[in-house]
């Protein structure tokens, strides 16, 4: 939580560099996890809690490295093969009431580089609660979902991102 007391001008804050991962199974369905809501985070008060894995890019880390790391930290998945990298970075802005609070109060939203992977392993390797390596659980459930349904499952302020991601990777299930 930010210690800032008044309204924060979003234009004064940067976007947090992140990666997002669309993981498809052999049937062409996409892995989605239901977020655990933490009071004060960007999902607080949301009812659409399903999302694909995503996370920050550490200083000095390449996006592809961050993608593999985040996927493992959030889901335990290692048995994946890269299908494609989205050509563009996709941004989203936090809603005004979350600027200065969510994302540790440091960012106006995220700029995300998306990757599509094929899950090649056995579902028994998927571990979300607890995830491997002592990481904090981000999801309490997971399911394979049809790609076209993803935008309606995500919190509304990230919906445009999911529409763009689905458009970028739709051909992978055609």
UniProtKB/Swiss-Prot annotation:
Pfam families linked to this entry: NUDIX
Entries under InterPro entries matching the protein: Nudix_hydrolase, NUDIX_hydrolase-like_dom_sf, NUDIX_hydrolase_CS, NUDIX_hydrolase_dom, RppH
Covalent S-S links between cysteines: none
Keyword Hydrolase on entry: yes
One Gene Ontology term from the biological process aspect of the record: ribose phosphate metabolic process
Source species, domain of life: Bacteria
Enzyme class, broadest EC rank: hydrolase
PROSITE patterns according to UniProt: NUDIX, NUDIX_BOX
EC number: 3.6.1.-
Record-annotated Nudix hydrolase domain positions: 14-167
GO function terms (MF aspect): bis(5'-adenosyl)-pentaphosphatase activity; guanosine-3',5'-bis(diphosphate) 3'-diphosphatase activity
Position of sequence motif Nudix box: 55-76
Keywords associated with the record: Hydrolase
Cofactor(s) named in the record: a divalent metal cation
Described function: Accelerates the degradation of transcripts by removing pyrophosphate from the 5'-end of triphosphorylated RNA, leading to a more labile monophosphorylated state that can stimulate subsequent ribonuclease cleavage.
Family label: Belongs to the Nudix hydrolase family. RppH subfamily.
HAMAP family tied to this protein: Nudix_RppH
Name assigned to this protein: RNA pyrophosphohydrolase
């Amino acid at each position: 939580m930010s210690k800032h007391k008044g309204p924060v001008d979003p234009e004064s804050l940067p976007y947090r560099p992140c990666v997002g991962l669309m993981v498809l199974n052999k049937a062409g369905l996409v892995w989605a996890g239901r977020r655990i809501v933490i009071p004060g985070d960007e999902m607080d008060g949301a009812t659409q809690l399903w999302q694909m894995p995503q996370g920050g890019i550490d200083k000095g880390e390449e996006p592809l490295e961050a993608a593999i790391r985040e996927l493992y930290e959030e889901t335990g998945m290692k048995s994946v093969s890269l299908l494609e990298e989205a050509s563009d970075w996709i941004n989203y802005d936090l809603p005004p009431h979350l600027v200065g609070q969510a994302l540790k109060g440091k960012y106006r939203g995220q700029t995300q580089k998306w990757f599509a992977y094929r899950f090649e392993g056995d579902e028994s390797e998927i571990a979300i609660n607890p995830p491997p390596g002592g990481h904090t659980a981000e999801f309490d459930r997971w399911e394979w979902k049809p790609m076209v349904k993803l935008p309606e499952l995500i919190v509304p302020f990230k919906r445009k991102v999911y529409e763009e991601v689905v458009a970028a990777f739709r051909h992978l299930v055609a």
